[in-house]
Regions:
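Cytochrome P450 catalytic domain signature, combining two hallmark sequence patches
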Residues: 59-76
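Long, hydrophobic/aromatic-enriched structural stretches that serve as scaffold segments
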Residues: 75-138
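Short amphipathic alpha-helical molecular recognition features
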Residues: 45, 52, 83-87, 107-110, ...
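Generic preference for well-ordered alpha-helical elements
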Residues: 12-14, 50-53, 57, 88-92, ...
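Short hydrophobic alpha-helical segments that form membrane-spanning helices or hydrophobic packing faces
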Residues: 56-57, 130-137, 170-175
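N-terminal BTB/POZ boundary and linker segment
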Residues: 1-55, 98-113
Length: 201
């Protein structure tokens, strides 16, 4: 049986790409408390512009090239439906707003879990160039609350500061983790460099 489809936003009312975004079926290690209710578990539909997606995201640029099946279908039919699985729809909608220059819709503050989720999606969809000053605004309220002792939250800070290119913060939390961790650093399924985690290649 197909999952229920919920209508999301038209980030471009005349867009030629329909993005069918489905949330993760299981909690991720980096946000174990994030559970999707039956109401939230359905697919969310977003309308977007292939031009904006391709310019903003290396992931979509590759996926929409005419050499690929999706790109060929777009060229042939003038529109396409793309599945975007295992993706938090709310965070993805924020990135779509940034990609489509809808900055009035972008929040200036987010929860820490939302900050981590946004970093995960920015890293995956490779859309760093559309962020502007938003990461600094999102991070600033949480800096003073970060832990002084190594824990799982330290690992999240390593990832967030790395993705959002906060070099001073990255150096601080990375040194803390390397200095205080007694074994390999548990990455919580985040793509953190092996040079930091201590794992051999």
């Amino acid at each position: 049986m197909n999952p229920e489809v919920n209508r999301g936003s038209d980030h471009d009312p005349n867009g030629d790409v329909i993005l069918m975004v489905s949330p993760p079926k299981k909690p991720r290690a980096y946000v174990p408390s994030r559970l999707y209710s039956d109401e939230d578990a359905g697919v969310v539909r977003y309308r977007a512009s292939s031009k904006h997606l391709s310019l903003a995201s290396q992931y979509f640029e590759k996926r929409l090239k005419k050499e690929w099946r999706e790109g060929e279908e777009l060229q042939k039919n003038g529109c396409i439906e793309l599945d975007v699985p295992d993706t938090d729809p709310e965070a993805f909608s924020i990135l779509l707003d940034l990609m489509h220059c809808r900055t009035q819709e972008v929040p200036t503050s987010v929860t820490f879990d939302e900050l981590v989720e946004l970093a995960v999606q920015v890293d995956y969809f490779q859309c760093h160039g559309v962020l502007g000053l938003y990461p600094a605004r999102w991070i600033e309220p949480w800096k003073a609350k970060r832990p002084n002792a190594y824990c799982d939250e330290t690992v999240k800070w390593i990832f967030v500061s790395g993705v959002f290119n906060d070099c001073e913060l990255y150096a601080s939390v990375t040194c803390l983790a390397i200095r205080q961790s007694k074994d390999f650093i548990n990455t919580l399924d985040l793509p953190i460099p092996r040079s930091v985690t201590g794992e051999s290649i």
